[in-house]
């Protein structure tokens, strides 16, 4: 399955919530009615079955982090093999992706833009260029914008946007040097309460 490159608003409308796929402090434009399903007439959402609810939650999280289905299932399997709550492990694995850490540090205004920065070799980890968006960042790793990309306007603008919306506590960033330290893997309480990871576990456990 190819990566989705269509309207971001459509995905948020499909899930009925703001997925923060667009740049800016407020991810959606005012004209994007997330209360209505995609389409000209915005069909009303009927009552969902348990399976439908579980599927929508999985799709929502997958789209938030920009992960394809096969990758997402792989993360679930890795999470299930670790000690602790599978759902929490899953979210932590997604949070440790390099493209997500770049986004959390504010070098990219969206996860999609952050993934592009990584793919285009604009990011280094511990002084070495890494161009794999799914690379798992570990506590203590130093993530930085490479010297050749320091002057990119989009990075400067992304840092300004991040300063407005607030930066997460598990990264320590020097905005002037465009470098940061991934201090620790976030606890479940640090992450969005709008995600019900237990529904995803129930879906994959069938």
From Swiss-Prot:
SUPFAM superfamilies given in the database record: Alpha-L RNA-binding motif
Family statement: Belongs to the universal ribosomal protein uS4 family.
Listed transmembrane segments: none
Name of protein: Small ribosomal subunit protein uS4
Role of this protein: One of the primary rRNA binding proteins, it binds directly to 16S rRNA where it nucleates assembly of the body of the 30S subunit.
InterPro entries: Ribosomal_uS4, Ribosomal_uS4_bac-type, Ribosomal_uS4_CS, Ribosomal_uS4_N, S4_RNA-bd, S4_RNA-bd_sf
CDD domains reported for this sequence: S4
Gene encoding the protein: rpsD
GO BP term, pick one: ribosomal small subunit biogenesis
Keyword line: Ribonucleoprotein, Ribosomal protein, RNA-binding, rRNA-binding
Subunit (UniProt): Part of the 30S ribosomal subunit. Contacts protein S5. The interaction surface between S4 and S5 is involved in control of translational fidelity.
């Amino acid at each position: 399955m190819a990566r989705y490159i269509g309207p971001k608003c459509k995905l948020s409308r499909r899930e009925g919530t703001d997925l923060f796929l667009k740049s800016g402090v407020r991810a959606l434009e005012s004209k994007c009615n997330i209360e209505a399903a995609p389409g000209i007439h915005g069909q009303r959402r009927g009552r969902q079955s348990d399976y439908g609810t579980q599927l929508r939650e999985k799709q929502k999280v997958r789209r938030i982090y920009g992960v394809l289905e096969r990758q997402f299932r792989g993360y679930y399997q890795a999470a299930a093999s670790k000690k602790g709550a599978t759902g929490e492990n899953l979210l932590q694995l997604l949070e440790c992706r390099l493209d997500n850490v770049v986004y959390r540090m504010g070098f990219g205004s969206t996860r999609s833009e952050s993934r592009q920065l990584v793919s285009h070799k604009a990011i280094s980890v511990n002084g070495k260029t890494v161009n794999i968006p799914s690379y798992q960042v570990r506590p203590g790793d130093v993530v930085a914008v490479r010297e050749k990309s320091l002057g990119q306007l989009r990075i400067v603008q992304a840092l300004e946007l991040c300063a407005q919306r607030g930066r997460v506590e598990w990264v320590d960033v020097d905005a002037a040097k465009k470098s940061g330290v991934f201090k620790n893997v976030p606890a479940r309480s640090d992450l969005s309460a709008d995600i019900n990871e237990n529904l995803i576990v129930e879906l994959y456990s069938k």
